Regions:
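Conserved N-terminal entry element of GNAT/NAT acetyltransferase domains
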Residues: 1-18, 160, 166
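Acetyl-CoA-dependent GNAT
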Residues: 14-84, 88-92, 157, 165
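Short, P/G- and charge-enriched loop/turn segments at secondary-structure junctions
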Residues: 38-40, 145-153
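Conserved beta-strand-loop-alpha-helix junction that forms the acyl-donor binding cleft
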Residues: 79, 108-117, 129, 133-140
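Conserved GNAT acetyl-CoA-binding A-motif
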Residues: 98-110
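Conserved active-site tyrosine of GNAT-family acetyltransferases
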Residues: 121, 126
Length: 166
């Protein structure tokens, strides 16, 4: 589903138990804490299943997810270097795992300011599924380190769900 060529030198592998400290560290670096709050739920990505993208023995990306009632929810996804196909490879790994587990849908949540993510996911077959006005404001009560202003100076207030059938 990607325009262009997949990087051939990237290994996608499941998160292993010995990766958990690294996942916790990366989560803190990328998300500001070891905990992520989405749709009023708190998640600890280091405790979740996921996939690591490696290039030349170094981490190039990470995705974590949770499965509930036949829906695989992406909790975090990060490509450490953009526009190199890492995010797409991680999405494809999640889709394959969702299919293997018998899930009928993959979903995720992003924020109203994350224009790049909205473009990325929709180009990969995800559709807008729900809008939660004020959800980030509520999450900030639990996790005050969430900034008030996001990408492009846009006030960070709302959550947007996207979903894709498996």
């Amino acid at each position: 589903m990607m325009d262009g060529v997949f990087p051939r030198d990237v290994l996608i592998r499941p998160v292993a138990d010995n990766d958990r400290p690294t996942v916790a560290w990366l989560t803190t670096q990328l998300w500001g804490a070891t905990e992520v709050v989405v749709h009023d739920d708190a998640f600890h990505p280091a405790d979740l299943p996921g996939f690591i993208a490696e290039r030349a023995g170094r981490i190039a990306g990470l995705v974590t997810f949770e499965v509930r009632s036949g829906v695989m929810e992406i909790v975090t996804i990060n490509a450490l270097n953009l526009y190199q196909g890492i995010g797409t490879l991680l999405i494809e790994a999640v889709r394959a795992e969702a299919k293997r587990l018998g899930c009928h849908e993959v979903m995720l949540t992003t924020t109203n300011d994350n224009i790049g993510a909205l473009r990325f996911y929709q180009r990969r077959g995800f559709r807008l599924a729900a809008l939660r006005p004020g959800a980030v404001d509520r999450s900030r009560q639990h996790k005050p380190e969430i900034p008030r202003t996001g990408d492009f100076g846009i006030p960070l207030r709302d959550e947007i769900d996207l979903s894709c059938p498996v």
